[in-house]
Each structure stands twice: as C-alpha cells, then as structure tokens.
UniProtKB/Swiss-Prot annotation:
Binding-site residues for [4Fe-4S] cluster 2, renumbered to this chain: 179, 183, 186
Physiological role: Catalyzes the methylthiolation of N6-(dimethylallyl)adenosine (i(6)A), leading to the formation of 2-methylthio-N6-(dimethylallyl)adenosine (ms(2)i(6)A) at position 37 in tRNAs that read codons beginning with uridine.
Cofactor binding remark: Binds 2 [4Fe-4S] clusters. One cluster is coordinated with 3 cysteines and an exchangeable S-adenosyl-L-methionine.
Gene that encodes it: miaB
All residue ranges annotated as the Radical SAM core domain in the record: 165-398
UniProt-annotated location(s): Cytoplasm
Record family assignment: Belongs to the methylthiotransferase family. MiaB subfamily.
Lineage: Bacteria, Pseudomonadati, Pseudomonadota, Betaproteobacteria, Burkholderiales
Swiss-Prot/TrEMBL keywords: 4Fe-4S, Cytoplasm, Iron, Iron-sulfur, Metal-binding, S-adenosyl-L-methionine, Transferase, tRNA processing
Name of this protein: tRNA-2-methylthio-N(6)-dimethylallyladenosine synthase
C-alpha cells in the first residue's frame, strides 16, 4: 500500500505563520466572489497570497479597501454582466489610489477586453494565475499600465500558494482543475482548461495540515471532482477518486468528508462502494443531472441517459437508503418541448431531490449550444422554471418536516445569520440548523454536537442541543 509523506505538515505551517509571514502592512483587500465553491476556494487563496506577500488583511467594506478583487463567474450571462455593474460602483475609489483586479472565469474568457470596457481596472488574471497576483500588481506599478495574465500553466499555482489559513472547523481543498467533458452549453473547459489532478500526496498533506489546525470537515473540490486521477508519490501509480477518499478518511482529526461537483459518468463502482466502507463520507450527494429528457441530454452532450443516472442513484440508495440528494437543472435548452419538460418533472418525482440549483438556459459565446436555434419564448421558459422550483420546494418542505423529532449530528460553524445571539451549524445532509447555545455558546463553535430538531423551515431547521451522559 502506498504510504504518503505527511510528516512535514505541522513544521511547514508553523514556519510560515510564525517566521516568514510579513507583518500587517495596514493595507486591506476586499474580495467579491461570484459563482461556485471552486471560486470561494480561489478567493480564499487570493487573500492568503496577498497576506503572505504584502501583509494585506481582509475587509468586508470596499470603501475601506486598498485593493478590490472581483472573482468572477461566466456560467451565466447575468453573473457576467453583474461584474461590470459592480466594477462601475467602485470606479470612484480610483481617485484615492485603490487598485482594482478582475479574476476568475470572466477574466479568463474576456482577457484584455475587460480593460477596454473598464480601463480603470489594474490587473486581469485567470483561475490558474492567481498566485501571480503580487507580481502583476508590482509590474503594474513599475510599467504604469494594466496587466493581463490569463494563461493556463496547468497546476503550477499550487506550487506557489502559501499554506492555508484556517477560519473555522470546515475547509475547502481543491484536488483538481479544469474539465474535459465539453458539454455543449458550458464554458468551463475554455476558462479553466482541461482536467488536471493535483498529486495524491500533495492533497493529503494539505488535508493533514488543515486537520492539525482544527479542521473537522473538508470539502474536496473540482469541476468534475470524481474524475480525479492523481500521481502517487514518485511512482507511475495513479490514484482514482475512491482511493483518495480512503486515504483522506484515515487522516486523524477529519470527521466529515464532502465533495463537489461530481459527474454521473465518473460515478464508478468503487466510488459507490466507498459509501458502504467510509462512515466519514457524509450522507449527502450533489450529482448534477441537468435534464430529464434523453433527447435534451444528448443535445447537451452529457454522455448518459436518464436510466443510467437513475441506476446510479438506485445503487447508492441500496447502500445509504436515506442519503440526501441535490442536483442541477437547466430549463429551456434549445429545442426543449413540453414533453421534454414533463420528463424532467417526472424525474424529480421519481428521485425526490432535497434541493436543486436551477436556471434558464443562458447561451455562452463560443459554446456549441450558443449556435442552436431556439424558438421557445422566455415566458414559457420562466413558467417551466417556476413549476420545477415549486416542486423542488415541496420536496424540501416534506423532507425537512420528516426530520422534526430526530437527533442530528451538527458541526457548529458560528453565529446564526437569523439571530447573531444564537448559533448555527450544518447536518450531514447539508441542512442548516439554528439553535440557542446557552451560556457556553462560544465553546461550542467548531465542535460536533447532537441537536434534536424541533421546527422545520423552508431552507433551515431549528433545534436544541442534546446533553450526553
């Protein structure tokens, strides 16, 4: 069995934090994140890079910032246009010398065109070049002109990122970049490049380092996370995703493992079997299906049928009967008929999804689907979306109500968003639970505790701590 080298993790983390990190410069960075959890991870890394290189500290107020970064998403046109709207709102801050940068997938897709549209932007960088941000800003100062770097140096950025700084008991770990599926509607392969997996030992070292700092839950990230194929040490051996999960499962201190986003075509028998052997693997899965019609799935170039998707779910439920399932849907793909939509609604009834991210089809420039003839009115698409979302909401309500009276294991994350005097945490099945932590509330943050569910709301639960003997 392969034995990864993990012993250097505590020393490395300590030396960076205690010895080499620059003193706070007084400068502040504001980062606005759009889109997926991969972007959230990248935003954290931007903050880490600027803290390590220049001593920047984060701020939630752009008016107080010396550097403003927009980490963008190009999956839908609305998200892309919002970036330029937000850029316009901070333009006035240039008068006092604030630096502005645009990163992420819009940056990768548009490149120098962003400077043409918003000439007050100082740097434009892609998902694979965020580690070069300090150098780009320095070059901007030396040359007196905006800098653009949207190249794809594969996985180079991970070799130049400082060790992760922990904020809470849960953390993201990116295990791969890019996508090689080339679905007809999707820009990700063009903005993040082809699939490239981080080395196996490197991922395990990062997770072990997080565990040493008190992290109890890790979410493994990738555009197609279950397509992971990482090189094992100095050998020619390759670890698949199921193997990686096994090794992460054995890291002391890690109590929960999540991952996103997975692809149905990469749901191997070994991955399904992992749900029987790995209790730390949470009882929740996000598995995008996108549509319930085989004809539309073919047009999307998803590579599977509805029956194949349902077969995967059936095998999973044979192992974990109460597994919580969420998914993605695209409504109004070119050529979608009433019958196609009805098939999607039937799939929702058949599976019983806990939640979904659903949107009207947004043609993205440069993708094959953008050239398809689309004769369905926006009003029809909107009505279909509303029907789909209402059905999912009914499912969510019923499933939440069934949890009333049960005891759920909850990782306490911090103050409740509903009431800062209370606490909130997350169940294995990814439900938020709000509760009164009592006089010892501060000591509960970061801990796993049992909560008896007393009330069900549309998108959260309420409960009370259960005292153990």
């Amino acid at each position: 069995m392969h034995t990864p080298t993990l012993t250097s993790t505590p020393t490395t983390a300590t030396s960076v934090v205690d010895d080499t990190a620059p003193a706070a410069s007084g400068k502040k960075v504001y980062i606005r994140t759009f889109g997926c959890q991969m972007n959230e991870y990248d935003s954290d890394k931007m903050s880490d890079v600027m803290a390590a290189a220049e001593g920047y500290t984060p701020t939630d107020d752009p008016e107080q910032a010396d550097l403003i970064l927009f980490n963008t998403c190009s999956v839908r046109e609305k998200a892309q246009e919002k970036v330029f709207s937000d850029l316009g709102r901070v333009k006035h801050l240039k008068a006092r010398g604030v630096l502005i940068g645009v990163g992420g997938c819009v940056a990768s897709q548009e490149g120098a065109a962003i400077i043409e549209r918003a000439p007050y932007v100082d740097v434009v960088f892609g998902p694979q070049t965020l580690h070069r941000l300090p150098q780009m800003l320095a070059q901007r100062a030396r040359q007196g002109r905006p800098q653009v770097d949207i190249s794809f140096p594969e996985i180079e950025k991970f070799d130049h990122l400082p060790p992760a700084k922990v904020d809470g008991a849960a953390a993201f770990v990116s295990i791969m970049e890019g996508c090689s599926k080339y679905c007809s509607y999707c820009v990700v392969p063009y903005t993040r490049g082809e699939e490239f997996s981080r080395p196996f030992d490197e991922v395990l070292t990062e997770v072990a380092g997080l565990a040493d700092q008190g992290v109890k839950e890790v979410t493994l990230l990738g555009q197609n996370v279950n397509a992971y194929r990482g090189r094992m040490g100095d050998t020619s051996d390759i670890a698949d995703f199921a193997t990686l999960l096994e090794y992460v499962h054995e890291i002391p201190g890690i109590e929960r493992i999540r991952y996103t986003t997975s692809h149905p075509n990469e749901f191997t028998p070994a991955l399904i079997e992992a749900y029987a052997r790995l209790p730390k693997l949470v009882n929740h899965l996000h598995l995008p299906v996108q549509h319930g019609s085989d004809r539309i799935l073919s047009g999307m170039k998803r590579g599977y049928t509805v029956l194949e998707y349902k077969s995967t779910i059936r095998k999973l439920r044979a192992i974990r009967p109460d597994i919580s399932l969420s998914t993605d849907f695209i409504v109004g793909f070119p050529g979608e008929t009433d019958d196609d939509h009805a098939r999607t609604m039937k799939l929702i009834d058949d599976i019983g999804f806990d939640a979904s991210f659903s949107f009207i089809f947004s043609p993205r420039p440069g993708t094959p689907a953008a050239a398809l003839h689309d004769d369905t009115s926006y009003e029809v698409k909107l009505a279909r979306l509303q029907q789909l979302q209402a059905t999912i909401e009914d499912n969510v309500r019923r499933i939440s109500e069934r949890r009333v009276g049960t005891v759920q294991r909850v990782l306490v994350e911090g103050p409740s968003r509903r009431d800062p005097n209370e606490l909130m945490g997350r169940t294995e099945c990814n439900r938020i639970v709000n509760f009164d932590g009592g006089p010892n509330a501060a000591r509960l943050v970061g801990r796993m505790i049992d909560i008896r569910i007393t009330l069900a709301y549309p998108h959260s639960l309420r409960g009370e701590p259960v005292l153990r003997d």
